[in-house]
A protein has these predicted regions:
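Catalytic core of membrane glycerolipid acyltransferases/transacylases, capturing the structured
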Residues: 11-67, 123, 127, 132-134
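Structural detector of well-ordered beta-strand residues that form the stable sheet scaffold
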Residues: 1, 39-41, 117
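Non-catalytic C-terminal accessory region of glycerolipid acyltransferases
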Residues: 68-167
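Short, conserved glycine- and acidic-residue-centered signature motifs
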Residues: 5, 20, 101-102
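Single conserved hydrophobic/aromatic residue that forms the stacking wall/gate
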Residues: 2-13
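Structural alpha-helical scaffold elements that stabilize or flank donor/cofactor-binding regions
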Residues: 5, 54-55, 108
């Protein structure tokens, strides 16, 4: 029998590898299974009718990637003004191989003073693991190395689309 198993627990959720559109749905099922209502950021181009209504209903936050205002400040404000706010981020910024991860998730967690919960999806074993949290120290190189090392053993649906870059 094929079953999806989860291990562990733990307010920025960093989910990887992100190699397929299915990752969103699997992630939402996982968060529901652990009793977390999470928000996620997605490029605004996906928020057209009727998909936009669906994405917003399940926690989607449209992001204008060309806008100059600080997304870090916007998300930090959401943390400050919410009793419970959980944000899931896939820092590759795309479903294609990208060794240059976006670092916004790190700066959001640092500024909001919340832990980064590391959540790995492993398609071959049908497992989602959430067994590690990283509290940002301000030493981004050290912290990013620790984060990337956690994800090295996870395989996405399309493993060729996941690149850890230099560890």
């Amino acid at each position: 029998r094929d079953r999806l198993r989860s291990r562990g627990l733990g307010d920025v959720y960093k989910r990887q590898p992100h190699t397929s559109n299915w990752d969103l749905f699997i992630g939402k099922l996982f968060y529901g299974a652990i009793g977390r209502k999470t928000s996620f950021m997605m490029k605004k181009e996906w928020f057209f009718f009727p998909l936009g209504l669906i994405f917003k209903a399940v926690g989607g936050i449209p992001v204008n990637r060309g806008r100059k205002s600080s997304l870090v400040d916007q998300m930090t404000e959401k943390f400050a003004n919410s009793k419970h706010f959980h944000l899931a981020i896939t820092p590759e910024g795309t479903r294609k191989a990208n060794p240059n991860w976006k670092k916004g998730f790190y700066y959001i967690a640092l500024k909001a003073q919340v832990p980064i919960m590391l959540i790995g999806i492993d398609y071959p074993s049908k497992t989602i693991s959430s067994t590690k949290a990283v509290m940002p120290t301000g030493d981004i190189e050290k912290d990013m190395r620790e984060i990337k090392l956690y994800f090295k053993n996870f395989k996405g649906k399309n493993p060729e689309n996941f690149d850890l870059g230099n560890i």
